[in-house]
Amino acid sequence: MNIVIAILSPGAMGSAISARLVEHGARVLTSLDGRSASTVNRARAAGMEDVSPETIASADLILSIVPPGEAVALAKALVTRLRESRHKPVYIDCNALSPKTKTEIAGTLAETGCDIIDGAIVGAPPQPGEKGPRLYVSGDQSGRASVLRTLGLDLRQIDGPIGAAAALKMSYAGINKGIMAIGTAMLLAASRSGASTGLYQELGESSQYSLF
């Protein structure tokens, strides 16, 4: 029997991950009510099935991959449906949120009886023939996400509570931005002093500075 996964919503990341899951044998559900024509076409191209909001609760796992500002509202909108469903899917919030907000979402969904997992996607949407982004998961029930590893996703489990995966993503992003900011400042300083050509040459030869 195929694993059934609901992905909300089919944006650039959600549809690309859906395509990877479908490629590896999963059945992927979504709800396209009120969505734009471009979103509908993207979802269909990824092999996603348009189902009623009520059917979403029948999935084995629900992956929330929405704009960060919509994540809390989505969780609240699903509470009644998930609470009343006899089938209890695993809910993985994969959005770029703070650890505090991830904990808030877990609290919102606690009454549903569903297992809640904190997820964090690091990397670009998966492309055909490429490994794709890393999906970090944390929380007491994070082991229940392991099936995603068999469906083509690069799943990384963190031994930490809800919020740990979110903290990893925030820290990683902060380090990258800090490195780039320092690098840009140094390149500008070199340029002002007439050393930019030599600096670029040196950076090109020094593998440890290949980021720049």
Language model: regions and residue ranges:
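NAD(P)+-binding Rossmann beta1-loop-alpha1 motif at the extreme N-terminus of oxidoreductases
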Residues: 1-58
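Rossmann-like NAD(P)-binding element
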Residues: 51-100
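Helical "substrate-binding/catalytic lid" subdomain
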Residues: 168-212
